[in-house]
Each structure stands twice: as C-alpha cells, then as structure tokens.
C-alpha cells in the first residue's frame, strides 16, 4: 500500500523535525534570542498534534473496513 508507506515516511520526518526543533529551542534558551522560544514551542505543539493525528490515521488504515 503506497499511501501507507508514504504516510509512515511522513511520520518519521515529523519525528526528525521535532528533534531538530527541540535542539533549536535548547540552543536559543538563555541567549539574546530567548524571545524565539514561544514561537518554537508553538510550532512544536502543532507538529506534535499533526503527528498524533497522522498516527491515528495510520492505525485506522490498518483496520479492516
């Protein structure tokens, strides 16, 4: 199922993006760019929400219809 494989790949990409975003937040915390943290955390929140939704979709795709 090509769609399932594509969505699984997208989920992995989101996981990698979240890791990089966490690293970026760590890098700016306590610096003169500390003001970016609110935006970075908001982006993280949306990406986590999208990843959860994608995970539910992948689970639903595996159930027989």
Q: Model-predicted segments: where are they?
A:
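Short intrinsically disordered terminal tails
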Residues: 1-2, 61-65
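N-terminal acidic leader/helix
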Residues: 1-28
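Short, charge-rich amphipathic interface segments used for partner binding and complex assembly
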Residues: 27-63
